Amino acid sequence: MHYTLGFQPHRTGGLVKYSTDLMNEQVNQGHQVFALSPAIQLCFSEKFVIRKVNSDGIEKSEIFNGLPLALFGGIKDPNAFMTNCDGGEYERYLYRVNPDIIHVHTLMGIHKEFFTVAKKLGIKIVFTTHDYYGLAPLPTFFLNGKSYDRDNTNQSWQEMSVNAWSTKKLKLFQFKFYPLLRKLTRFLKREKHISNNIAKNNQDYKNLILYYKEIFSYMDFFLFNSQLSQNVYSHNLENYVGDIIHISNSDIKKRVVCDLSRLRDKLNIAYIGPSEEYKGYFEFLKLVEALPKNKFNFSTYGHDIKENLPNYIKQYGKYNKIEISNVYKNIDILIVPSLWKETFGFIVLEALSFGVTVLASKNVGAKDFLPKENIFSDITEINENTIIGAKEIEFKLKSIKEHTFDIVRIYQNV
């Protein structure tokens, strides 16, 4: 049985993609698979209830009127995120599905009672470290240029939650029209930097910090998706058992590609991702300014086109899965300059699968696949010689089928 954030199209991102692909492959390998995820807040009732919603090989159930999802800006009201519930509802659900093991992909939206009931029933629990929610109120552990993974205190939670939305507003995003609401978020006013507002956030997060630490203590095995994520978790948790298991998904496969870089007058250097500080977008712009324009072309993908960028940066905006081959055909060097301690980073494997050379920040978990020459601590370390000397990587990509076999073996040994 899996607990995940949800399914496409209502939820997106690497966590959702990975958990869905893993479940589908487990079904293909003959396993019976159940999925539980947070659902909408019912308007006509506040009663917490679990309902079976459909079955397409995976039996899917949803938690209605569960805990709020801290999808934006941290946690404003700590008490709302540790509300007690009827543990009997979880017990009835677990009795019905009778899982051999529970695989947890996130702590968002799930009550502590789920874990206490599972332990009472003797069900083993494994946890994949997709992000840092629970260790912190922000999945990234990062705000305004600072990673808080080494400074995790009550005051840190206050600072990380200075831009938090109200619980009522967060619950709006648990409706099925969430994707539309997400598009509208850019029109909603939010503070971008911590200022004197920090003095106004006097919430006490100590009990919530202990609440999540107790939940983590119920995990029988941690599946760390990189050395980096293991380092962050081990610094903030005690007495855990786990191992590094690099993740995959159904789109990661070795492709036969032609090296077009020799046919070009200039190497094409690109950034793929949101135009956000934590992803290193502005670091990429710094790099562009530092490199000679007569020797390199620059491009960005994966976010809305910006009006204020110089015309020597080609902006291709967002793209869909069908276009992905054409995207990578036009990239020689991909820069992955994340500032947050990114637990993995599927974009690295994706690029490598297309034969694209990757230069990644030390903050990217998937740097585990790169030679040290392709890893940088600061964007200023990258120069013309660094790019020309960057190494192409030859390595065996694990398919989702192979990865699933590995995960099932871990289940059997927990």
Q: Which functions belong to the PLM regions below?
A:
Residues 1, 223, 261-279, 285-288:
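Conserved donor-binding/catalytic core segment of Leloir-type glycosyltransferases
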Residues 1-55, 121-124, 286-292:
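N-terminal subdomain of nucleotide-sugar transferases
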Residues 35-97, 169:
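A conserved catalytic-core segment of Leloir-type glycosyltransferases
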Residues 92, 148-221:
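Membrane-proximal helix-turn-helix segments that form the acceptor-binding/catalytic region
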Residues 303-304, 313-328, 339, 364:
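Conserved active-site histidine-acidic residue motif and adjacent donor-binding/catalytic loop
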Residues 348, 357-360:
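Short hydrophobic beta-strand element within catalytic cores of glycosyltransferases
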Residues 363-376:
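Short acidic/histidine- and often glycine-rich active-site loop of Leloir-type glycosyltransferases
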Residues 382-414:
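A charged, aromatic-enriched C-terminal amphipathic alpha-helix characteristic of glycosyltransferases
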